[in-house]
């Protein structure tokens, strides 16, 4: 799964004939410059505008879940198995079997997942698009995807590319004798590339992403630009297994794998297939995105020999790890520990390792010539499993207990290819395993009767008469629901994990105030549930959201508007035992502009972190804008700070934030006392009127955000503001409710 990082791809050049496009280079130079080019510090709002729904050719009514559930999955699997051993002349299969190639494809599709922001992973099928389709580490996976095209063409919309890319690797393992624990569909296709921060480097295979302590900058997971994980020859090409182990532990940890899962994945994945380095990388042409149009999406055209088969160049490393490259075995671990390994170089010049014992030189069959034999190989990153004391202990245990190893690899593989899918409720198909795993963030099923409209009205009354303030109720509901990440579908209000470790202690959540609110809501919950004789219940997860809704309805009524905030019961309460504390720590908000909270450890500015938060919540620019304006007047800042509370009537839902922000009666200056704070003075009297953060003022300073702010500040926008705020609020409250579709509110003034 690891690919080399020597200057293999440095010789790539544009393969378009100048006689066909004589002014191509000139046209590139004359390409219009973006606003970001002219003003690099301008706040980038593009994350809130992707993906663009108009890019999807399937249309708004397309329901992928319905299509997938109508698919004959067994027929697809049989077609995949047949494909595995049907070698094509245009890209011959190693050992007559494409299985190892498909495993690598699946691994590299899913393995981009990272825990700190939930981005990456197989969902969307982004391996088809730039930059992933042209990463050095994904060399020749363009052929793997093209091999799958007849199957995708046959089954069409019933199976997405995203699902097919993963299913192919799973079936490959099964067809080669390994028993997986299942497969879940449900990954919808993306239709355009999206901008993701993959690192600061300006060149492929560079590594300039470490902080002063040598650790990867967050949220990155890979150690090198253009690689999935680490340099297989060792950090910076230095063949040091112990140093490689440190990098492996860091990067695999950032893709949600512990030490045992890491060893299982490497040892299991390298039980199959081989690496390819028949010659130097100088023979390779450009990656797909830079290749000539006549290549039709293919890249890395190889001018060495036949350019394929025995002459294939991918990573520059060359050889197989085991004597059974197309059959599941435990030979990888046997070889790792049974031999002493000596450093050598592949025909392509990459550093790798072979057994010291010359008797091992004919153990491994050749991929194409049955008369040839080879020695097994190991990479520096493989030897990390032997020499790192923690990895070695695990690997030896797996060697001595093959069944335990099989189970560990099956579980780690399933986690790898499903980690970015979110809760089990999103899983589709007949191959979904019945076992519930803690990394799936499970919640209990609804095994009771849900509350009806009369109950909801009664409960709202009790909440509003409990002594809890509008601010407290809104903040608690927001803190619970806004943990949701639309990248990997984690977090959200379902489960009421805000009452559990670690969320109950997060500084952004005002732990002392939160404990008071939860205690009051739990009392209301218990009194209601104990009074029911028909099995009806309200969960705390539902009650937290209902409390926020009730507070907003009251705040709108005080502004002169009657509105019902849509509420859909059905959330349940998770237990601490269902919650992996360490796993949830990465969801902690280090900044939340909606609550005017910012931890100075961030390496991005407060406005940038606001956009990041809104992006994770899948909000649009107007939704982000209206929510900030509403949260400010509802006095919902962390710590009850008054920054941006531009109203003399806090707790009442109105458009005062925008009206007062845009008023020319105020002159803004940087605070001379507090860094990052701004003070607004009355232009006539010089009296201090407001204090604000850069998150507040960005809605007046950024031209695009100001345009939206103006739309909510007009005299005729008061009802629209409330309507839009409630709709955006409901979107956040129901973001993790994959079982429903959010409803819009209706307003009466």
UniProtKB/Swiss-Prot annotation:
UniProt gene name: katG2
Stretch forming the signal peptide: 1-27
Catalytic activity field: H2O2 + AH2 = A + 2 H2O; 2 H2O2 = O2 + 2 H2O
Organism of this sequence: Legionella pneumophila (strain Corby)
UniProt name for this protein: Catalase-peroxidase 2
Quaternary data: Homodimer or homotetramer.
UniProt similarity note: Belongs to the peroxidase family. Peroxidase/catalase subfamily.
PANTHER family attached to this UniProt entry: CATALASE-PEROXIDASE (PTHR30555:SF0), HYDROPEROXIDASE I, BIFUNCTIONAL CATALASE-PEROXIDASE (PTHR30555)
InterPro entries, alphabetized: Catalase_peroxidase (IPR000763), Haem_peroxidase (IPR002016), Haem_peroxidase_sf (IPR010255), Peroxidases_AS (IPR019794), Peroxidases_heam-ligand_BS (IPR019793)
């Amino acid at each position: 799964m690891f690919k080399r990082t020597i200057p293999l791809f440095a010789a790539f050049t544009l393969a378009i004939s100048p006689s066909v496009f004589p002014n191509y280079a000139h046209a590139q130079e004359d390409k219009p410059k973006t606003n970001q080019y002219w003003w690099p510090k301008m706040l980038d709002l593009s994350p809130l505008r992707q993906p663009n729904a108009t890019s999807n050719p399937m249309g708004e009514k397309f329901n992928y879940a319905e299509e997938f559930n109508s698919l004959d999955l067994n027929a697809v699997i049989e077609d995949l198995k047949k494909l595995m051993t049907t070698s094509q002349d245009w890209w011959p299969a190693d050992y007559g079997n494409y299985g190892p190639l498909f495993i690598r494809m699946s691994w590299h599709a899913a393995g981009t997942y990272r825990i700190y922001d939930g981005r990456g992973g197989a969902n969307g099928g982004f391996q088809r698009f730039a930059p992933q389709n042209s990463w050095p580490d994904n060399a020749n996976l363009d052929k793997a995807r093209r091999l799958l095209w007849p199957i995708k063409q046959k089954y069409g919309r019933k199976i997405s590319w995203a699902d097919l890319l993963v299913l192919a690797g799973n079936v490959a393992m099964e067809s080669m004798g390994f028993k997986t624990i299942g497969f879940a569909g449900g990954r919808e296709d993306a239709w355009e590339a999206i901008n993701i921060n993959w690192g600061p480097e300006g060149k492929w295979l560079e590594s300039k992403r470490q902080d002063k302590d040598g650790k990867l900058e967050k949220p990155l997971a890979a150690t090198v630009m253009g690689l999935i994980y680490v340099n297989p020859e060792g950090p910076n090409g230095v063949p040091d297994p112990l140093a490689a182990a440190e990098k492996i532990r860091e990067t695999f940890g950032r893709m949600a794998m512990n030490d045992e899962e890491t060893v299982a994945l490497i040892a299991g994945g390298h039980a199959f297939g081989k690496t390819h380095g028949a010659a130097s990388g100088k023979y390779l042409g450009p990656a797909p995105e830079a290749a000539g149009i006549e290549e039709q999406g293919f890249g890395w055209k190889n001018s060495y020999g036949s350019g394929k088969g025995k002459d294939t160049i991918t990573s520059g490393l060359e050889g197989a790890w085991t004597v059974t490259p197309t059959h599941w075995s435990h030979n990888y671990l046997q070889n790792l520990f049974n031999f002493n390994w000596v450093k050598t170089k592949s025909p392509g010049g990459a550093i790798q390792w072979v057994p010291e014992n010359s008797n091992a030189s004919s153990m491994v069959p050749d991929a194409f010539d049955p008369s040839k034999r080879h020695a097994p190989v190991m990479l520096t990153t493989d030897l990390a499993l032997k020499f790192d004391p923690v990895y070695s202990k695990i690997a030896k245990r797996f060697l001595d207990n093959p069944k335990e190893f099989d189970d560990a690899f099956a579980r780690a593989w399933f986690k790898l290819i499903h980690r970015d899918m979110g809760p089990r409720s999103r899983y589709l198909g007949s191959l979904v395993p019945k076992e519930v795993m803690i990394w799936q963030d499970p919640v209990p099923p609804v095994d009771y009767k849900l509350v009806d409209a009369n109950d909801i009205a009664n409960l709202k009354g009790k909440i509003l008469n409990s002594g809890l303030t509008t601010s407290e109720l809104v903040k608690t509901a927001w803190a619970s629901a806004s943990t949701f990440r639309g990248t990997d579908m984690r977090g959200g209000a379902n489960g009421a994990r805000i009452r559990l470790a670690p969320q109950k202690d997060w500084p952004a959540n005002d732990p002392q105030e939160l404990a008071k609110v939860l205690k009051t809501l739990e009392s209301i919950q218990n009194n209601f549930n104990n009074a029911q004789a028909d099995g009806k219940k309200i969960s705390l997860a539902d009650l937290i959201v209902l409390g926020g809704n009730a507070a907003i309805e009251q705040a709108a009524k005080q502004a002169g508007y009657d509105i019902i905030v849509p509420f859909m019961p059905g959330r349940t309460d998770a237990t601490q035992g269902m919650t992996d504390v360490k796993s949830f720590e990465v969801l902690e908000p280090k900044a939340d502009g909606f609550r005017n909270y910012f931890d100075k450890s961030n390496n991005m500015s407060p406005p940038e972190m606001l956009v990041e938060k809104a992006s994770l919540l899948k909000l649009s620019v107007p939704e982000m804008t209206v929510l900030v304006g509403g949260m400010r007047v509802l006095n919902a800042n962390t710590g009850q700070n008054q920054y941006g509370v531009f109203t003399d009537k806090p707790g009442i839902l109105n458009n005062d934030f925008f009206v007062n922000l845009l008023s020319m009666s105020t002159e803004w200056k940087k605070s001379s006392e507090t860094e990052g704070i701004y003070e607004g003075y009355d232009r006539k009297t010089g009296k201090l009127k407001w204090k604000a953060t850069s998150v507040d003022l960005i809605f007046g300073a950024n031209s695009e955000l100001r345009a939206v702010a103006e739309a909510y500040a007009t005299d005729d926008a008061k009802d629209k503001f409330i309507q839009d705020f409630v709709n955006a609020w409901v979107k956040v409250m129901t973001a993790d409710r994959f079982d429903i579709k959010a409803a819009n509110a209706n307003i009466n003034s």
